[in-house]
């Protein structure tokens, strides 16, 4: 199915219809904009709470080191990531100014300078409309990523009321940021929503007020910074056991958030983008083996006891902890070199894995722990592979709303005008003989030419109904493709739960929509297979297999309707 082609064909039909109606002046341009929008890249907004780790997440997702990351909240405005080739690698970002100045390529140092809330930083940020990153990544060929500042910066402004009271400029900038953030997210075709391990209560309000079109169809949740979770474990628990507890708690928390926002988000996955970034950087630089060698100088019976999550102990310049580490051959300069610029909790997780596992196993464990490969796979399936479908679906829904408005508001209004005109024409007819008949006839002719008649309005109504029916059919076709695509993804995951290659081949043909092979299936066969798969759905304990078989039964149901 070519979503863009079919969407544009339908919009062309709508435009041709509008051209021949009294609403040409008001609506033709709008539908032409819908036509143009159908062919543009899908807009994917990254939204969420302030300090939820959006910049770290984007860096990890795109394999970049561009978006500013730090412990200080970044003041910068909207960040837009588009596909292309950077002309000057030393200036990887283009600044778009509020005052209309020509866009200006800038260095990474400029981006890093937008952290904090000094008067100098605020003055610089006030002049920026947005920052644009050109990224040579094929994922972005049909998707534009937009990183927003974070909704909690104003919604929760009471948390920093005193700081804002003494800095009106900061409050003004915050207000501008939240407004732009909301506007962009509201206009986005799809959303990645980032939250900490505990989503703030105003997240639900943000969904309803700023993203009314959000649904599991076009939104995925990310529970970020799982490296910050402190495990609830008994005394004496080993360090690797603590990490497994963190992973378990992260999974439970993300499942809780997924259930909380089940009507808004397709899923909520736990990630640590900082961990993923640091692991890749450490192994790429070849320093992982050296770090492992240094960490393992700590005797095994002492590691669990002395290596804890208190950074002050690791960086102690004197006292018992410093003495202990020096006896292990780890003086302060070595300890500082090992930790580098890694966030402390991320360093702890990496150190424990390197101490406990062989090098390759440690990397596999850490990458899996970070969750980034899983979220990349989900985003690829939910957004990057579906960008055309998401974009066209959004355009069609907006066009549908306009057509419904014309039918329910504009048509009755025009009908009222026609009825008033009929009354007026009757008055003119009754006035013959009392006034100049030629003048009355001319007046009546003018009224008839410039207003539609009731029959015309009935035809307009029928045409709109026909267009809405076609639109609904196209949207359902897209939804059907979405469902079968989801089924194909599930089929690969649960292949081992099927009874051999024959069952797999049956479902692959069914979900692939191979019309020639499906035409050969009789109604009796479809009915029998639907009952068998429905029974299997009731029996299985696998949630993924249940989801797949629900789609399978639905597909057989549709085939039966056509038999």
What feature does the model see in each segment?
Residues 2-45, 264, 280-514:
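Extended helical scaffolds that flank P-loop GTPase cores
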Residues 538-562:
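Charge-dense, extended regions
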Residues 85-91, 164-187, 236-241, 404-438, ...:
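Intrinsically disordered, low-complexity coil segments
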Residues 5-12, 16, 34-318, 369-381, ...:
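Globular "head" domains of long coiled-coil molecular machines
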Residues 509-519, 537-546:
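Short acidic, glycine/serine/threonine-rich helix-capping segments at coil-helix boundaries
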Residues 271, 390-397, 541-544:
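Short, glycine/acidic-rich hinge or "gate" loops at secondary-structure transitions
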Residues 343-352, 522-533:
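Short glycine/proline-rich, acidic loop/turn segments that cap or connect secondary-structure elements
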């Amino acid at each position: 199915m070519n979503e863009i082609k079919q969407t544009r064909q339908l919009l062309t039909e709508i435009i041709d219809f509008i051209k021949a109606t009294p609403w040409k002046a008001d609506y033709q341009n709008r539908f032409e904009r819908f036509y143009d929008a159908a062919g543009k890249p899908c807009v994917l907004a990254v939204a969420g709470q302030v300090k939820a780790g959006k910049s770290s997440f984007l860096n990890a997702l795109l394999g970049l080191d561009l978006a500013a990351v730090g412990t200080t909240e970044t003041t910068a405005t909207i960040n837009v990531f588009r596909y292309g080739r950077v002309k000057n690698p030393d200036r990887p970002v283009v600044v778009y100014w509020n005052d209309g100045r020509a866009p200006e390529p800038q260095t990474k140092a400029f981006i890093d300078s937008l952290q904090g809330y000094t008067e100098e930083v605020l003055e610089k940020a006030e002049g920026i409309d947005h920052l644009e990153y050109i990224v040579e990544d094929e994922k972005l060929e049909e998707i534009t990523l937009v990183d927003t500042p974070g909704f909690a910066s104003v919604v929760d402004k009471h948390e920093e009321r005193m700081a804002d009271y003494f800095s009106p400029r900061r409050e003004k900038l915050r207000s501008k940021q939240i407004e732009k953030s909301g506007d962009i997210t509201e206009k986005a075709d799809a959303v990645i929503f980032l939250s900490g391990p505990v989503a703030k209560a105003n997240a639900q309000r943000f969904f309803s007020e700023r993203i009314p079109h959000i649904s599991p169809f076009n939104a995925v949740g990310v529970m970020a910074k799982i490296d910050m979770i402190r495990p609830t474990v008994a005394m004496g628990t080993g360090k690797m056991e603590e990490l497994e507890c963190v992973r378990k708690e992260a999974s439970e928390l993300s499942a809780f958030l997924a259930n909380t926002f089940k009507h808004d988000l397709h899923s909520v996955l736990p990630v640590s983008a900082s961990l993923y970034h640091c692991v890749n950087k450490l192994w790429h630089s070849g320093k992982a083996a050296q770090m492992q060698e240094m960490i393992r100088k700590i005797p095994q019976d002492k590691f669990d006891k002395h290596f804890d999550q208190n950074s002050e102990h690791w960086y102690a310049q004197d006292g018992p902890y410093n003495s202990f580490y020096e006896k292990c051959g780890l003086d302060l300069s070595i300890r500082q070199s090992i930790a580098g610029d890694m966030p402390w909790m991320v360093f702890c997780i990496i150190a424990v894995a390197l101490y406990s596992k062989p090098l390759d196993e440690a990397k596999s464990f850490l990458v899996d722990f970070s969750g980034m490969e899983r979220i990349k796979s989900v985003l690829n399936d939910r957004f990057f592979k579906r960008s055309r479908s998401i974009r066209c679906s959004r355009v069609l829904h907006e066009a549908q709303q306009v057509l419904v408005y014309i039918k329910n508001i504009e048509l009755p209004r025009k009908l009222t005008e026609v009825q008033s005109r009929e009354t007026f024409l009757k008055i003119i007819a009754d006035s013959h003989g009392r006034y100049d008949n030629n003048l009355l006839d001319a007046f009546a002719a003018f009224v008839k030419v410039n207003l539609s008649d009731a029959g015309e309005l009935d035809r307009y109504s029928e045409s709109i109904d026909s267009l809405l029916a076609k639109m609904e059919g196209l949207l359902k076709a897209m939804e059907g493709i979405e469902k079968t695509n989801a089924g194909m993804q599930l089929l690969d995951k649960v292949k081992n739960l099927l009874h051999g290659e024959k069952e797999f081949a049956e479902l692959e043909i069914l979900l692939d929509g191979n019309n020639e092979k499906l035409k050969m299936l009789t109604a009796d066969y479809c009915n029998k297979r639907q009952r068998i798969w429905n029974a299997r759905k009731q029996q299985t304990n696998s949630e993924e297999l249940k989801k797949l078989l629900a789609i399978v039964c639905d597909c057989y149901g549709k085939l039966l309707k056509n038999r």
